[in-house]
Amino acid sequence: LSAASWRTQSIYFLLTDRFGRTDNSTTATCNTGNEIYCGGSWQGIIDHLDYIEGMGFTAIWISPITEQLPQDTADGEAYHGYWQQKIYDVNSNFGTADNLKSLSDALHARGMYLMVDVVPDHMGYAGNGNDVDYSVFDPFDSSSYFHPYCLITDWDNLTMVEDCWEGDTIVSLPDLDTTETAVRTIWYDWVADLVSNYSVDGLRIDSVLEVQPDFFPGYNKASGVYCVGEIDNGNPASDCPYQKVLDGVLNYPIYWQLLYAFESSSGSISNLYNMIKSVASDCSDPTLLGNFIENHDNPRFAKYTSDYSQAKNVLSYIFLSDGIPIVYAGEEQHYAGGKVPYNREATWLSGYDTSAELYTWIATTNAIRKLAIAADSAYITYANDAFYTDSNTIAMAKGTSGSQVITVLSNKGSSGSSYTLTLSGSGYTSGTKLIEAYTCTSVTVDSSGDIPVPMASGLPRVLLPASVVDSSSLCGGSGRLYVE
């Protein structure tokens, strides 16, 4: 699937080992602290696609599929998929190649898409970097394919980050020399075959900062699909240039400021506002970035705040701003795991509860986004405009003038009072009838061109023209504009 076609998708990210088991158990033990395989499988994903599709997601991103180091080390097992050894074999803990093809087929039968996590940067070895037996790697079976051993100690030194190794002295991550023609040829051929063999629609690329940038244009091109890269860094000046070599990157610059703005009622809205402007100016196309507030590498949002209103605000942001929304499995169940490995809880232990408060919130928010896309062909590429802030509130407009979606977010939390926010600068003219899509409340733009937005309990508000909502399946409308 092309980068342009990915703009309108929404992605549910899961670690295959932690989402669903082949036996469909919802009680099988998964102690995250043990850092071992918990029994998730590709068949387990297939069996619970209704749960994912029920939130309106159109795609899933699954953890890496390659054969991993087999040992149970002091750092645990390779259940996450980032310690690969044999790139032409699939991880048998998750099933067979046919099971993976069946997952791809099951998604496509629903009109959904498959994104696979890939790791061109490194392999994985159970042992010290000085003692690696390179013959265990297929096809990179000699040290000539790799950078000489040195651990990354200074993450601000880009040369070191690219040339030295991630990992530690228990599990070393031998760093492939991606400047070598032999390495490039193998990876470019491999990624083309991966996409072809499993009908893959998109790729998430791990550890992008650790690879020389000029490796990626050939890799992205060979894949023939949308590629979004991971750069775990909050600086748009260093992240955005990677859009010259990849379709998109994960939106870490927004992630950090979104977290800081909404983790408490004293969070900085102004820093988020400034970062929205920075990303818009520094990145060549913010609509191709991957938006998230949770993943498997950072503590969950609920670890910072247990407040449901604050959680709803950050979710509304990732869906209704520029970029492709990504939700990490368990986020919809308000999981609260801290840093790695505690943020890698088994989804099945929630019983796949479709009545959970954030499950239904995500479903509604996804429907609002799909309605905006259906109603306005320019919506998805229209630059999001953060046009109002106060100490607790940010308001944004996205879409063609006259049908723009107005999103109002608050960090006040569930104890926030009820009040009317007089919102100016939305671009709507006096007398325009709007509907707030979460509460189905009618609002009319006043004679000054201001919108009287009814705020309560620190909850987000999203306003669309009444004519658009009335033609949708939201708020008891006619359903003429198809929204799942």
Swiss-Prot record:
It comes from the Eukaryota. Its main location: secreted. It catalyses: Endohydrolysis of (1->4)-alpha-D-glucosidic linkages in polysaccharides containing three or more (1->4)-alpha-linked D-glucose units. The record marks D297 as: Transition state stabilizer. SMART domains: Aamy. CDD domains: AmyAc_euk_AmyA (cd11319). Substrate binds at W83, H122, R204, L209, E210, G234, D297, R344. Disulfide bonds join C30-C38, C150-C164, C240-C283, C440-C475. Gene3D superfamilies: Glycosidases, Golgi alpha-mannosidase II. Keywords: Calcium, Carbohydrate metabolism, Disulfide bond, Glycoprotein, Glycosidase, Hydrolase, Metal-binding, Secreted. GO terms for biological process: carbohydrate catabolic process. It holds the Pfam family Alpha-amylase. It is found in: Secreted. Its EC number is 3.2.1.1. The active site is at D206 (nucleophile), E230 (proton donor). InterPro entries: A-amylase-like, A_amylase_C_dom, Glyco_hydro_13_cat_dom, Glyco_hydro_b, Glycoside_hydrolase_SF. Its cofactor is Ca(2+). SUPFAM superfamilies: (Trans)glycosidases (SSF51445), Glycosyl hydrolase domain (SSF51011). One of its GO terms (molecular function) is calcium ion binding. Binds 2 calcium ions per subunit. Calcium is inhibitory at high concentrations. Glycans are attached at N24, N157, N197. Belongs to the glycosyl hydrolase 13 family. Monomer. This is Acid alpha-amylase.
